[in-house]
Amino acid sequence: MKTFDSLYEELLNRAQTRPEGSGTVAALDKGIHHLGKKVIEEAGEVWIAAEYETDEELAGEISQLIYWTQVIMVARGLKPEDIYKNL
């Protein structure tokens, strides 16, 4: 099972090693504007899932929101510790 920290490390590794065919690398290459739109999209899907879907579907949408948020973190050079100090 992945954790917030292990997912971040995986995404950071992909950004650094740039494996061919990586969706994360492709998203990073599209820039912050694209990534921001994905975060907004996923946040909306979390809201809809919270209103109308099962807990399992909601958990899936929340995981996608966390993924895209972490891709933005990688793009901007933020580390989990930068987030933790604001919780």
Swiss-Prot record:
HAMAP family with a match to the protein in the record: HisE (MF_01020)
What reaction(s) does this enzyme catalyze?
A: 1-(5-phospho-beta-D-ribosyl)-ATP + H2O = 1-(5-phospho-beta-D-ribosyl)-5'-AMP + diphosphate + H(+)
Q: Which domain of life does the UniProt lineage start with?
A: Bacteria
Question: Where is it found, in Gene Ontology cellular component terms?
Answer: cytoplasm
Write out the GO MF terms.
ATP binding; phosphoribosyl-ATP diphosphatase activity
Q: Which family does it belong to?
A: Belongs to the PRA-PH family.
Q: Which PANTHER family match?
A: HISTIDINE BIOSYNTHESIS BIFUNCTIONAL PROTEIN, HISTIDINE BIOSYNTHESIS BIFUNCTIONAL PROTEIN HIS7
Query: CDD domains this protein is in?
Result: NTP-PPase_HisE (cd11547)
State which Enzyme Commission number(s) the record gives.
Answer: 3.6.1.31
Q: In which pathway does it act?
A: Amino-acid biosynthesis; L-histidine biosynthesis; L-histidine from 5-phospho-alpha-D-ribose 1-diphosphate: step 2/9
**Subcellular compartments:** Cytoplasm
Q: What is its main location?
A: cytoplasm
- Biological-process GO terms, alphabetical: L-histidine biosynthetic process
Supply the alphabetized keyword list: Amino-acid biosynthesis, ATP-binding, Cytoplasm, Histidine biosynthesis, Hydrolase, Nucleotide-binding
Record's SUPFAM superfamilies?
Answer: all-alpha NTP pyrophosphatases
Q: What class of enzyme is it?
A: hydrolase
Q: What is this protein called?
A: Phosphoribosyl-ATP pyrophosphatase
